[in-house]
Amino acid sequence: MYDLILRRGLNKKKVTVCIILLILLVTLATISGIRFAEHHEVKKQAKLYEEQQAQIRKEEEEKQRQEELAKQAEINKRIEQTSRAFTDEEKDRIKHIYRSTGEKRVFLTFDDGPSETVTPLILDLLKKENVKATFFTLGTNVNNYPDLVKREFDEGHYVANHGYSHKYSTVYASPEATLNEYNYTEDAIRKALGNNSYMSKLFRFPGGSNGGYYDEAKQNSKALLHENGIMHLDWNSLSSDAAGEKTKEALLQNVKDTMGEKDSVVILMHDSSDKILTYEMLSDLISYLREQGYKFENIYDLLD
């Protein structure tokens, strides 16, 4: 009897152990299955993520490619516009730039540059504000800082001509002397841009095209320039930054006072090495012009 009871007890223990082992096996199998499923899902999600990232990279690369194509197309257009003579229609638009067109527009222009101290700051700000300007460059400074001239062109600004020396007695010695000053600077610009076909065809007379001691010489020079297909451009608003103003607030007020209620405004400023106040004022000027509803343009906007 005792042996029977003992055997039954052992059998019971065996059954219990078997049940426990079975439970453990089922549990392990379940855990393994869950982990396998989780691992499979992780791999699936990882693959999906990689595919999504690859698609994003592909789209970004395509977007970048399209932007580069658009940028190159713009550069090619600017090269074409500056590799030929102005049409009669383009000359008329420049000649009558101050004429109202039914909308408010403003041309920011900078003389006497480039300079290594002020011009880069102005270019950085214009790029940030997405504003294109017109730079009337001095030949001597073009030779000194060709990379800045190249940057001006590459970033969509119009590179125009302000003569080579800015010495009135030299520039206005004769009409031929004025033309020589123009040509010397054109050669410097072409060299800076690495483009032998570049022609700005646009000159700003040092001191303006009218008045002063050299007025008669200016008129004679103007006629010779026009005979050679070269237009000139003055201004109808200015910051007076060349007059020694001491604060950026004074510069801004000068622009406001001289532009008045004009619809088409050409603002004279300078980017020579001592005109840091012009840069410091520029952000406020851009904000003011936008508040007044002006659209920013440069000479390219007058060309076909």
Model feature map: region roles:
Residues Y2-T109, P114-L121, K127-K128, E249-A250, ...:
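N-terminal pre-catalytic segment of deacetylase/amide-hydrolase enzymes
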Residues D3, G9, G33, G102, ...:
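Residue-identity detector for glycine
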Residues R57, K63, E68, E74-R78, ...:
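Generic hydrophobic/packing signal
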Residues K77-A177, E181-K191, N196-K201:
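Active-site beta->alpha N-cap acidic-glycine motif
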